[in-house]
């Protein structure tokens, strides 16, 4: 690879190898069927032109055929919890034990500790090509935690950062408190979303109603930790699908985890997925987390994988 002077503005890159799905129809190929390399011209931070080439273009960064991909998107992170594994070891297996261990670690969560760990995580993400990151931030009361403000103050090193208030569902039980939480999130600046931890251990239909109503009133999008369990009695996604069929939500909803869909039959899951798709709900899977924590018991091999129904949700 060859690069112009570091003082020169980046106006484009030459001889980039793009994946086939990123090339326009009719892109020329070599005799062996391999697509030609590409010159990309930039203007105002966007790709202004895409030109087939096999020769380096003077004045552009010459990538000499290196693979070139769009910036990575991390749709589900927890910057407030990063780099805690060395001091946070669950005594039991499974999700709820992991949550308990993380709550025990909160005694270390000074503002300086949060800044140090979250900054390191963002820097590592940027170094690995992440350009957009959404971080959930645990709330433990109706008041915004220190991490909510500290993560807002981070140097984002070129990453577009979103914050989601991850609030336990019972905190939405009282309408006035639900309204206060939504108001705080809405007044926290750009790229803030309302979220909730929704599980059979804390299920409350009235709190769900208050959560969605308050988010709608304050023009907030939602990203919900919902049905993160392999339990056929979990009700979150079923309730949400039914609620949206009667009360469409004005913003966008993401549902993270959704493991419970894999615990029932395809016949049970299909109508739920159809209703969620009809309302534009996005389903986010977290395979590494769910493979580790779902159906987990010390001394027993997990029988179920814990990954939500991604193929069926397409």
Residue ranges and their predicted role:
Residues 85-136, 142-156, 180-186:
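Alpha-helical scaffold segments that flank or form the walls of functional sites
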Residues 101-116, 164-176, 197-202:
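Active-site mouth loops of central-metabolism enzymes
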Residues 146-157, 174-282, 298-314:
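Histidine/acidic residue-rich metal-binding segments in metalloenzymes
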Residues 1-56:
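N-terminal metal-binding scaffold of metallo-dependent hydrolase/deaminase domains
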Residues 40, 45, 65, 76, ...:
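Divalent metal-coordination and catalytic microenvironments
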Residues 70-82, 137, 221-230:
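Histidine-centered catalytic micro-motifs
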